[in-house]
C-alpha cells in the first residue's frame, strides 16, 4: 500500500478495536504518537507489514489492550522505545515482534503476568541485543508461557560484603525486585562474601534451598540463622 497521509489529528478516543489498522501499509510513516489509545482493547496486527513505520508511540496508553498479537510483525523499520507501555491487561503477545528486524529496545518493565500466549514473540527479531534479551528474560521468564531460554544473556548485580545484607533484606521485603536485581536467592554468587553474621536472624519464614552457595571465603557466620524456629534447609 502507498498510503502515507497525515492522520495525526484523528480523534480515536472512542475506538476500541484497531486490529489490522495499518496491515500491509508499507509506506506509512506518519506521527500518531499523540493518539488517545485509552479505549482500545484490541490492536492485533496493527502494524503488520508496515515496513516503513518508525515514529514514536511510547506515550500511548495501552492499559486496556488485551490482545497484542502480531502488532509489529514484519515491521522491519520500527525501533522506538515502548518500554513504558502498561501491558498488564494483555493476554496475547504471540508473534508480536516476529521479523521486527530493527527492534532493539528494553521491555524490562513490562508486566506480562496475565499473558497466556507468547509463542514466537521475538522470532527472527535479529536486531535485539544480547543485553536487552537478558533484561527481557529476567522480567518475562517468571511467566511459565515464556518460550525462550535467554538465561545466558542475563546479568545480575554482584553480591559482596557491601550489599549482601541489603540483598537479603530485599528478598524478604520485595522478592520480585530482589530476583530481578540479584537473581533467585538459591542461585546467588556469594563467593566474594566474607561476612554472613546474623544474615537471616529472626527470619522465621525462610526455607529456601541455598545449599549450592559457595561460602568458601566466609570467615564470619555466627548467628546466621538465629531465630525461635530452626530452618529446614541450610
Q: Predicted regions span which residues?
A:
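Negatively charged
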Residues: 1-227
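A short, hydrophobic C-terminal helix/tail in secreted or cell-surface proteins
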Residues: 228-234
